[in-house]
Curated annotation (Swiss-Prot):
Protein family (similarity comment): Belongs to the CTP synthase family.
Matching Gene3D superfamilies: 3.40.50.880, P-loop containing nucleotide triphosphate hydrolases (3.40.50.300)
GO cellular component: cytosol
InterPro entries for the chain: Class_I_gatase-like, CTP_synthase, CTP_synthase_N, GATASE, GATase1_CTP_Synthase, P-loop_NTPase
Residues bound to CTP: 13, 148-150, 188-193, 224
Catalytic residue list: 381 (nucleophile), 507, 509
Protein name: CTP synthase
Record function comment: Catalyzes the ATP-dependent amination of UTP to CTP with either L-glutamine or ammonia as the source of nitrogen. Regulates intracellular CTP levels through interactions with the four ribonucleotide triphosphates.
Length: 535
């Protein structure tokens, strides 16, 4: 039977529940247990697809086209297991499902209430993951902080879950903060005690405490937490701050987190194989070189808006024994002060995705600078569209070249709305989303990087290259190096007279892994290394 681990968080938000859940999944997989990880988000949006990156951070896209929380990216990267729309649940999606059932008469005229209807729907979503993927263990992260009113239906649902499936099949894990108080020169357990008290008042007794702290948790402190929180001392786990999130699995493995969890779930405590993980950490901690690349974006004030891009560069750095330093550059600053001020000494320029006209001219200028100065360039989604706009304006002589998204009446819409998007009215979940095949053109940079004839990448867009301009593009030194299998949609472009200039309509960052860097990011970082040598 599938076992269930529920991860809650206390004291403060952004405590790191997602990294703890992902790390636990990594440790289970290292013991040959199959794992699926589910995120329950308490916000009323149906999904984060229409939320501002400043509000929510990155929207992570799964193979099946779900727009999900960025934590699903951590789950995939740490466990090397693809997630799906089943792994992302919000309060909004729960209420939507319940209200749809009510409209269909599924409740036979009964009064629809939070208990049992909402809680039953939540439990059904957890069971659905177990049924559809049949893992040994389902880890469920409950978003928010214990004590928040928004999380109460989820907490009530997981309280009931232990009774439904049996005590030995469920484990409650609480991630909490043990702060260091400089004035007192000691760590304090009181916030954790109160957080556990709040959880117990709901009817949930945590089995394991994962204690976030910036220094080691002394044995006496663990015993105190054990005493006041009614948790065995061996189940009080120190999760000390690490220099990289990829160190966390090794940190909590040393503390015995996976071993203790498996024992409490009555599963065989197998010996882990973490050799590959240890090797990548060693390579990360001892880079042979340092390079700096610029990320020119619209949302650079919040790095989480580009989380998968950042992590993909980390992965490529590991693969090349390099530390990739990021220079965050606002596209609007380039509009105001010029590209040279921000980009003249970087070894690579990456322009990621985004929506809306703000900052687009700055991105176009950054791409022009990369092209003219022969600086390695990688464009992603909107980054490719901006590369096409830059080509139109500065290479093809189409001064009015633009995207129909930004200027619907432009006389040169080099980027146009996909035909299937013409009659779409709703914004949420209606883009070209998820995994699609792409045929690679032989004898191109893309072909040398992928070394495959057909690849599969994840998309999230409404607009696409306008084929009316394809011949003009090809006549000016550019190549279409990737298309949809029928040749209709342009998915990759590159510029031949350049050390490394490639842009994609899809989002390769969603498929990069710490132990398997994505070919495009790997090629980009290698080109940036060569650029550093030439400088």
């Amino acid at each position: 039977m599938t076992k269930f681990v529920f991860v809650t968080g206390g004291v403060v938000s952004s405590i790191g529940k997602g990294i703890v859940a992902a790390s636990l999944g990594c440790l289970f997989k290292s013991r040959n247990y199959s794992v699926s990880i589910l995120k329950l988000d308490p916000y009323i949006n149906v999904d984060p697809g229409t939320m501002s990156p400043y509000q929510h951070g990155e929207v992570f896209v799964t193979d099946d086209g779900a727009e999900t929380d960025l934590d699903l990216g951590h789950y995939e990267r740490f466990t090397d297991t693809p997630m799906s729309r089943l792994n992302s649940v919000t309060t909004g999606s729960i209420y939507q499902a319940v209200l749809n059932k009510e409209r269909r008469g599924a409740y036979m005229g009964g009064t629809v209430q939070v208990i049992p209807h909402i809680t039953n729907e939540i439990k059904e979503r957890i069971h659905r993951v177990a049924r559809n993927t049949n893992p040994d263990i389902v880890i469920t992260e409950i978003g928010g902080t214990v004590g928040d009113i928004e999380s109460l239906p989820f907490l009530e649902a997981i309280r009931q879950f232990r009774k439904d499936v049996g005590r030995n099949n469920v484990l409650y894990m609480h991630v909490t903060l043990i702060p260091w108080i400089p004035a007192a020169r000691e760590m304090k357990t009181k916030p954790t005690q109160h957080s556990v008290k709040e959880l117990r008042s709901i009817g949930i007794q945590p089995d394991v405490l994962v204690c976030r702290c910036d220094r080691p948790l002394k044995e006496g402190m663990k015993e105190k937490l054990s005493e006041f929180c009614d948790v065995p001392v061996e189940s009080v786990i120190t999760a000390q701050d690490a220099s990289s999130i990829y160190e966390v699995p090794l940190v909590v493995e040393k503390e015995g987190l996976a071993q203790q969890t498996l024992e409490l779930l009555h599963l065989e405590p197998r010996k882990p194989d973490l050799s590959q993980w240890q090797t990548l950490i060693q390579r990360m901690q001892a880079p042979k070189r340092h390079i700096e690349v610029a990320l020119v974006g619209k949302y650079v004030q919040l790095s989480d808006a580009y989380l998968s891009v950042v992590e993909s560069l980390v992965h490529a750095g590991i693969a090349t024994d390099s530390e990739v330093k990021l220079r965050w550059v606002s596209a609007e600053d380039i509009e105001n002060y010029g590209a040279d001020k921000y980009l003249n000494d970087v070894s690579g320029i990456i322009v990621p995705g985004g929506f809306g006209i703000r900052g687009v001219d700055g991105k176009v200028r950054a791409i022009e600078y990369a092209r003219k100065e022969k600086i390695p360039f990688l464009g992603l989604c909107l980054g490719m569209q901006c590369a096409v706009i830059e080509w139109g304006r500065n290479v093809a002589g189409l001064n009015s070249a633009n995207s129909a998204e930004f200027e619907p009446e432009t006389t040169n819409p080099v980027i146009n709305l996909l035909p299937e998007q013409q009659d779409v009215v709703d914004l949420g979940g209606t883009m070209r989303l998820g995994l699609y095949p792409c045929r690679i053109t032989p004898d191109t940079l893309a072909a040398s990087l992928y070394r495959q004839e057909v690849i599969y990448e994840r998309h999230r867009h409404r607009y696409e290259f306008n084929n009316a301009y394809r011949n003009s593009l090809l006549e000016t030194g550019y190549k279409v190096s990737g298309t949809s299998p029928d040749g209709r949609l342009v998915e990759i472009i590159e510029f031949s007279d350049h050390p490394f200039f490639i842009a994609t309509q899809f989002h390769p960052e969603f498929k990069s892994r710490p132990n398997c860097a994505h070919p495009l990011f790997l090629g980009f970082v290698k080109a940036a290394i060569e650029q550093t040598k030439s400088d």
